């Protein structure tokens, strides 16, 4: 099949683009190609900037804007246009579906496909080793494009309240909050394989971000063997695994100040009812099945 990618930058490591890198690799392994014209299907990430035809247009939609600090209706306007003309819509989580339909209404042809991880690549990556990390018995980690709703402060507080005597926390990414502690290390921006190497060494991966749709870092950390710690508001718990620690959290699907998340009570832990598949090969086949049904 010939596929057109829309609104994708394969040189970027943002959430949607990092997923694009994964699915492109799997599509190509299966013998599919990527073209700009004469395509069988167009896979559009979030919104169409090229005025593509609605025929064979599939929108991969993780979420929409709802932050009352901005004009979210204006921010959503082109996403809504793409949603209305797309032949099919792929949501990243049940949360994403509920979010989008509560603002945009129902679409006649949708599916939910959670993000996946490249297990063949992960198998080749070795757990990270260095003179600092090797001093600790248990490694905890977290990684994100840090902004207030990602709750770095809460991630750190959770670690400080639950760590063992010989545990450390490795924080990847550019932090928006600092806490000085001998057991906490800020490692900066890491490339994808170094992140995987960190996850493979981590016993726990903390992601208490508020209202995330389907964070790739959680999928990758889980695939690397880390136990996930997350909150219940958003789609994170859907990809965190049955053994995840889930902190009770809430949201009413109404516009809100995204960068002012509510406080968490770490004692309010709930059992995770989700156990999604994270094998990228199976995820890719789900995309193909949805994009080709009734056509080939």
Predicted regions: what they are:
Residues 41-69:
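Active-site proximal beta-strand in glycosyltransferases
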Residues 83, 197-202:
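Short alpha-helical donor nucleotide-sugar binding micro-motif in glycosyltransferases
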Residues 95, 116:
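Carbohydrate-associated surface elements
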Residues 129-150, 156-161, 169-170:
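Conserved donor-binding/catalytic core segment of Leloir-type glycosyltransferases
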Residues 176-196:
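Nucleotide-activated donor-binding/catalytic signature segment of Leloir-type glycosyltransferases, i.e.
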Residues 210:
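Aromatic "clamp/platform" in nucleotide-sugar-dependent glycosyltransferases that forms part
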Residues 227-230, 237:
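Short hydrophobic beta-strand element within catalytic cores of glycosyltransferases
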């Amino acid at each position: 099949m010939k596929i057109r990618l829309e609104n994708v930058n394969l040189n970027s490591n943002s959430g949607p683009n990092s997923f694009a890198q994964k699915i492109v690799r799997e599509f190509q392994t299966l013998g599919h190609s990527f073209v700009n014209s004469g395509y069988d299907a167009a896979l559009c990430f979030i919104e169409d900037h090229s005025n593509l035809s609605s025929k064979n247009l599939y929108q991969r939609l993780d979420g929409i804007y709802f932050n009352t600090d901005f004009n979210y209706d204006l921010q959503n306007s082109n996403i809504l246009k793409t949603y209305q003309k797309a032949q099919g819509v792929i949501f990243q989580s049940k949360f994403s579906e509920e979010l989008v339909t509560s603002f945009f209404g129902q679409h006649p042809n949708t599916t939910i496909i959670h993000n996946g991880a490249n297990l063949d690549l992960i198998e080749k990556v070795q757990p990270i080793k260095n003179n600092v990390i090797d001093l600790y018995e248990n490694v905890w980690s977290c990684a994100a494009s840090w902004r207030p709703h990602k709750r770095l402060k809460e991630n750190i507080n959770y670690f400080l309240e639950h760590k063992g005597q010989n545990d450390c926390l490795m924080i990847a990414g550019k932090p928006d909050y600092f806490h000085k502690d001998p057991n906490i290390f800020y490692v900066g921006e890491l490339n994808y394989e170094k992140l995987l190497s960190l996850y493979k060494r981590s016993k726990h991966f903390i992601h208490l971000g508020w209202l995330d749709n389907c964070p790739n870092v959680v999928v990758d950390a889980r695939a690397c063997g880390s136990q996930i710690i997350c909150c219940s508001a958003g789609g994170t718990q859907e990809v965190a695994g049955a053994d995840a620690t889930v902190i009770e959290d809430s949201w009413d699907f109404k516009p809100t100040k995204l960068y002012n998340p509510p406080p968490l009570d770490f004692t309010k832990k709930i059992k995770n009812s989700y156990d999604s598949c994270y094998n990228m090969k199976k995820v890719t086949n789900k995309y193909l099945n949805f994009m080709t049904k009734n056509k080939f």
